[in-house]
């Protein structure tokens, strides 16, 4: 999860997030290169005396600053499109969970486990135990297995919400009357936190998401939900 004074992204817990981190570093390298070239050009302009105000045409220069940005855009667009298509792939998920956004809590349905349904509310400060996180912990966590593809069906009952867990590289809008879906495969057990990432009203900041990822063998032994 995120921590104070953190500079980079959160550690990846899914293949998609690993790809996003690589793409972030790739794009950042290009941005640094552009900044260096611009600052270098400004430095030369401000320090050299060999300037001319009579230049009215420079075909070579115009060709370069037209082709070079096009190449840079292609270098950014190709890996971005690859990741975009990866996020849309649905490869035979092991099971499906439905998430419904409300003002201001989440409802989860384990359709493959006897239709288990429960609500997940943020824990008020008075109910926090030692080690719990303020504004991030919930009364009922979403328990999921690692190393198994999971499909999330996401919708809303009232206004726009967004179901997001940064460490998994997930952010899917919850839209009333529409069912969106996303898949992920977690690679490490642990507790992972997210929040509603679409402004949805006065208590938008108070509808967190907590995923408890456990080994697949333990998950298959039976219900382990913290209800």
Curated annotation (Swiss-Prot):
Mitochondrial matrix side: 46-59
Enzyme Commission number(s) from the entry: 7.1.1.9
Name of the protein this chain belongs to: Cytochrome c oxidase subunit 2
Family: Belongs to the cytochrome c oxidase subunit 2 family.
Textual note on the cofactor: Binds a dinuclear copper A center per subunit.
Function noted in UniProt: Component of the cytochrome c oxidase, the last enzyme in the mitochondrial electron transport chain which drives oxidative phosphorylation. The respiratory chain contains 3 multisubunit complexes succinate dehydrogenase (complex II, CII), ubiquinol-cytochrome c oxidoreductase (cytochrome b-c1 complex, complex III, CIII) and cytochrome c oxidase (complex IV, CIV), that cooperate to transfer electrons derived from NADH and succinate to molecular oxygen, creating an electrochemical gradient over the inner membrane that drives transmembrane transport and the ATP synthase.
Cofactor(s) for this UniProt protein: Cu cation
Chain segments annotated as coiled-coil in the UniProt record: none
Binding annotation for Cu cation A1: 161, 196, 200, 207
Catalytic activity reported: 4 Fe(II)-[cytochrome c] + O2 + 8 H(+)(in) = 4 Fe(III)-[cytochrome c] + 2 H2O + 4 H(+)(out)
Record localization: Mitochondrion inner membrane
Keyword field: Copper, Electron transport, Magnesium, Membrane, Metal-binding, Mitochondrion, Mitochondrion inner membrane, Respiratory chain, Translocase, Transmembrane, Transmembrane helix, Transport
Keyword Cell inner membrane: no
One Pfam family matching this protein: COX2
NCBIfam families tied to this protein: CoxB (TIGR02866)
Oligomeric and partner information: Component of the cytochrome c oxidase (complex IV, CIV), a multisubunit enzyme composed of 14 subunits. The complex is composed of a catalytic core of 3 subunits MT-CO1, MT-CO2 and MT-CO3, encoded in the mitochondrial DNA, and 11 supernumerary subunits COX4I, COX5A, COX5B, COX6A, COX6B, COX6C, COX7A, COX7B, COX7C, COX8 and NDUFA4, which are encoded in the nuclear genome.
Superkingdom assignment: Eukaryota
Taxonomic classification: Eukaryota, Metazoa, Chordata, Craniata, Vertebrata
């Amino acid at each position: 999860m995120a921590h104070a004074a953190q500079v980079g992204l959160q550690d990846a817990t899914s293949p998609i997030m690993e790809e996003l981190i690589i793409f972030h570093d790739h794009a950042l390298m290009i941005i640094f290169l552009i900044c260096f070239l611009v600052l270098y050009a400004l430095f030369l302009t401000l320090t050299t005396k060999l300037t001319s105000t009579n230049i009215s045409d420079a075909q070579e220069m115009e060709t370069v600053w037209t082709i070079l940005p096009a190449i840079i855009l292609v270098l950014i667009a190709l890996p971005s499109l690859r990741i975009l298509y990866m996020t849309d792939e649905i490869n035979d998920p092991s099971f499906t969970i439905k998430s419904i956004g409300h003002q201001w809590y989440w409802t989860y349905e384990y359709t493959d486990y006897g239709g288990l349904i429960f609500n997940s509310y943020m824990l008020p400060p008075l109910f926090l135990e030692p080690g719990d996180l303020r504004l991030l912990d919930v009364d009922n966590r979403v328990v999921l297995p690692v190393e198994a593809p999971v499909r999330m069906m996401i919708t809303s009952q009232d206004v726009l919400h967004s179901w997001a867990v940064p460490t998994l590289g997930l952010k899917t809008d919850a839209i009333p009357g529409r069912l969106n879906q996303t898949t992920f495969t977690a690679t490490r057990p642990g507790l992972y936190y997210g929040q509603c990432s679409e402004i949805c009203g006065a208590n938008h900041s108070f509808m967190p998401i907590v995923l408890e990822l456990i080994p697949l063998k333990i998950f298959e032994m039976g219900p382990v939900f913290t209800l």
